[in-house]
């Protein structure tokens, strides 16, 4: 500020610039009390402002442009349209004639779609549905509303079905929606046996049919299905498509057919027999089958076996601590492709989260978001790649909580609530959307690991709030009681735990002084723990899971570095080996395994 000096009464109207000196604008002269300050930011202001502007629009007040769409006139404010749409911003701020017009004609756009998009600009709300998506997406593309384009594509992803996937694919291609196009392609390949029966398949142009049947990932039991699909397509409109048969048949892998089918069905088909190019393709396949010694010289696209992606188990890594903060990100590992890919994030950041799978849905329970302890629960559906927050919360906040499924219930075991270490146990009934307390453990446990084996729930290790524990308790749901069993050989908190080959494995964690790489396993038949070869890295806050018969240790903290590496245990060689890494480093993240019944993981 400028500090003014020697201003006498009566001089307040004169120019005093020359009598001011520059100083700290936030500092008053010495001896003057500093005023109290309270910065204020209104969360309501943006919403309330938009609501008022929208009312002005509805009453046609202060509107400075009228959009003419077909027979419809839509009153609006240029500044709002320009703020939301690059299309309108270019129109109104450039040298185009529309920048000077009060009425602007918009062509090639649906009236109702334009109304919905203008409403969105003023309200931030829109509903995408079957009745409007086919007009809404082209309109959003024209107006360059990327957010609405994404919403429309997300809606169409959820509608994918063998009866409509080809239509959605064509729609995505027309409007350059690359991700939707990729997903529709994958869906078509994985569900080809059903897709080939659809009306959409019969209406395909030849070039799109070739694109589909050329894929190595086409999911068919045998090449016979591909041949039958092609012939059904040709015969659907035989006069038009008969000349296209040789071109399409080149992409059927005839050398992979059985000799009986090749000779008895393909070679005897009148359409094949009457075309020279088709006969040549059949002869090529016969030579491949009859002359095995010549096969190395005959390799090509038609002799390459298809490699459809089969359904299997997929590992999910959820939340955790990374780069100094709790994270909400989630990624999944597919053993068949050996890839980690990001999926939808949770609505909240969660470190120390408990994760388990119930009815093919992934649950994330409690945790800490970096500032608060949580009692909220989220549920992930791999079919839609979406998290839902409509799950009832636990009765108390919990982080470093153990979560497992037993008898159709989701159990939350121990943890801490920010005040004390917990021995409280409760279970969730998905049918009632309700948590109910069951018997508490005999020991308070945070950083506890849990496992289910033989109809019992095991609580392994953890900390009582003072020291790491080696004690183990087992819950009998029939009795609603906990019983103490044999302790581990090592005290461990924040360990990983999983059932593998009918034994409970406990790995890593932290003892009184350091992070651990050691591992041990519990045999319920002998009630004994025995050591297992140590992992290659120390890992506290590690996740442990069994994926397609492999025991995998995921992430953690080695005392210096947050880890994204994975280790796999080889029971025959009694060794651990490194097995790639996640996209994110994760300490205290949860892991869960879902059996993908319809190859959803390969689509998202």
Swiss-Prot record:
Keywords of the record: Actin-binding, Cell projection, Cytoplasm, Golgi apparatus, Kelch repeat, Nucleus, Protein transport, Repeat, Transport, Ubl conjugation pathway
Disruption phenotype: Approximately 50% of mice die until day 28 of postnatal development (P28). Mice that survive beyond P28 are indistinguishable at birth, but show a progressive corneal dystrophy, associated with an epithelial hyperplasia and an altered corneal epithelial cell differentiation.
Natural source organism: Mus musculus (Mouse)
GO molecular function terms attached to this record: actin binding; type II interferon binding; ubiquitin-protein transferase activity
Chief location category: cytoplasm
Gene name in the database record: Klhl20
Kelch repeats: 314-360, 362-408, 409-455, 457-502, 504-549, 551-596
Biological process, per Gene Ontology: Golgi to endosome transport; negative regulation of apoptotic process; proteasome-mediated ubiquitin-dependent protein catabolic process; protein K33-linked ubiquitination; protein transport; protein ubiquitination
Xref: InterPro entries: BACK, BTB-kelch_protein, BTB/POZ_dom, Gal_Oxase/kelch_b-propeller, Kelch-typ_b-propeller, Kelch_1, SKP1/BTB/POZ_sf
Subcellular location per the Swiss-Prot or TrEMBL entry: Cytoplasm, Perinuclear region; Nucleus; Golgi apparatus, trans-Golgi network; Cell projection, Axon
UniProt name for this protein: Kelch-like protein 20
Keyword set includes Cell membrane: no
GO cellular component, one term: trans-Golgi network
Pathway: Protein modification; protein ubiquitination
Function: Substrate-specific adapter of a BCR (BTB-CUL3-RBX1) E3 ubiquitin-protein ligase complex involved in interferon response and anterograde Golgi to endosome transport. The BCR(KLHL20) E3 ubiquitin ligase complex mediates the ubiquitination of DAPK1, leading to its degradation by the proteasome, thereby acting as a negative regulator of apoptosis. The BCR(KLHL20) E3 ubiquitin ligase complex also specifically mediates 'Lys-33'-linked ubiquitination.
Subunit structure and binding partners: Component of the BCR(KLHL20) E3 ubiquitin ligase complex, at least composed of CUL3, KLHL20 and RBX1. Interacts with PDZ-RhoGEF/ARHGEF11, DAPK1, PML and CORO7. Interacts with F-actin. Interacts with IFN-gamma (IFNG). Interacts (via kelch repeats) with IVNS1ABP (via kelch repeats); this interaction blocks the assembly of CUL3-KLHL20 complex.
Native organism taxonomy: Eukaryota, Metazoa, Chordata, Craniata, Vertebrata
Domain spans labelled BACK: 165-267
Listed SUPFAM superfamilies: Galactose oxidase, central domain (SSF50965), POZ domain (SSF54695)
Pfam family for this entry, one: BACK
Positions of the BTB domain: 63-130
SMART domains listed in its UniProt record: BACK, BTB, Kelch
């Amino acid at each position: 500020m400028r500090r003014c000096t020697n201003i006498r009464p009566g001089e307040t109207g004169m120019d005093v610039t020359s009598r001011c000196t520059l100083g700290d604008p936030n500092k008053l002269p010495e001896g003057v009390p500093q005023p109290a300050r309270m910065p204020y930011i209104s969360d309501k202001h943006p919403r309330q402002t938009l609501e008022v502007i929208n009312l002005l629009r509805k009453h046609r007040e202060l509107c400075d442009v009228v959009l003419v769409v077909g027979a419809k006139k839509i009153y609006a404010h240029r500044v709002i349209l320009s703020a939301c749409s690059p299309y309108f911003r270019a129109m109104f701020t450039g040298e185009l004639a529309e920048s000077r017009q009060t009425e602007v004609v918009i062509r090639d756009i649906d009236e109702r779609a334009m109304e919905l998009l203008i409403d969105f600009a003023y309200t931030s709300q829109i509903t995408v549905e079957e009745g409007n998506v086919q007009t809404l997406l082209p309109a959003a593309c024209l107006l360059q509303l990327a957010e609405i384009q994404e919403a429309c594509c997300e809606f169409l992803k959820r509608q994918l079905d063998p009866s409509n996937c080809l239509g959605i694919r064509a729609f995505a291609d027309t409007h350059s929606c690359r991700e939707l196009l990729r997903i529709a392609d994958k869906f078509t390949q994985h569900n080809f046996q059903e897709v080939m029966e659809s009306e959409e398949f019969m209406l395909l142009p030849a070039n799109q049919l070739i694109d589909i049947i050329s894929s190595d990932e086409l999911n068919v039991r045998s090449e016979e299905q591909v041949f039958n699909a092609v012939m059904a397509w040709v015969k659907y409109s035989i006069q038009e498509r008969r000349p296209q048969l040789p071109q399409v048949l080149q992409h059927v892998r005839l050398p992979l057919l059985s000799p009986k089918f090749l000779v008895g069905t393909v070679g005897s088909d009148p359409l094949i027999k009457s075309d020279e190019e088709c006969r040549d393709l059949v002869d090529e396949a016969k030579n491949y089958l009859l002359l095995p010694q010549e096969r190395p010289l005959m390799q090509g696209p038609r002799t390459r076996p298809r490699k459809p992606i089969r359904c299997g188990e997929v590992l999910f890594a959820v939340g955790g601590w990374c780069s100094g903060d709790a994270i909400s990100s989630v990624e999944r590992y597919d053993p068949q492709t050996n890839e980690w890919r990001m999926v939808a994030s949770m609505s909240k950041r969660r470190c120390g989260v408990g994760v388990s799978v119930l009815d093919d849905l992934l649950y994330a329970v409690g945790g800490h978001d970096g500032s608060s302890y949580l009692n909220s629960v989220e549920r992930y559906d791999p079919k839609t790649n979406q998290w839902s927050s409509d799950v009832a919360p636990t009765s108390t906040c919990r982080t470093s909580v153990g979560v497992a499924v037993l008898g159709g219930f989701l159990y939350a075991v121990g943890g801490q609530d920010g005040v004390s270490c917990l021995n409280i146990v409760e279970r969730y009934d998905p049918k009632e959307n309700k948590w109910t307390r069951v018997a508490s453990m005999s020991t308070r446990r945070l950083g506890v690991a849990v496992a289910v084996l033989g109809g019992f729930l095991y609580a392994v290790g953890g900390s009582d709030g003072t020291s790491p524990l080696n004690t183990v308790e087992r819950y009998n749901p029939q009795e609603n009681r906990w019983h103490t069993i044999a302790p581990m050989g090592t005290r461990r908190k924040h360990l990983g735990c999983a059932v593998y080959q009918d034994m409970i494995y406990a790995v890593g964690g932290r003892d009184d002084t350091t992070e651990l790489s050691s591992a041990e396993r519990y045999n319920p038949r002998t009630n004994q723990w025995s050591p297992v070869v140590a992992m290659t890295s120390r890992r506290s806050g590690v996740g442990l899971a069994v994926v397609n018969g492999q025991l995998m240790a995921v992430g953690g903290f080695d005392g210096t570095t947050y880890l994204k590496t994975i280790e796999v245990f080889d029971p025959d060689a009694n060794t651990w080996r490194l097995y790639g890494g996640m996209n994110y480093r994760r300490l205290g993240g949860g892991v869960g395994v879902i059996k993908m019944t319809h190859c959803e993981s390969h689509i998202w």
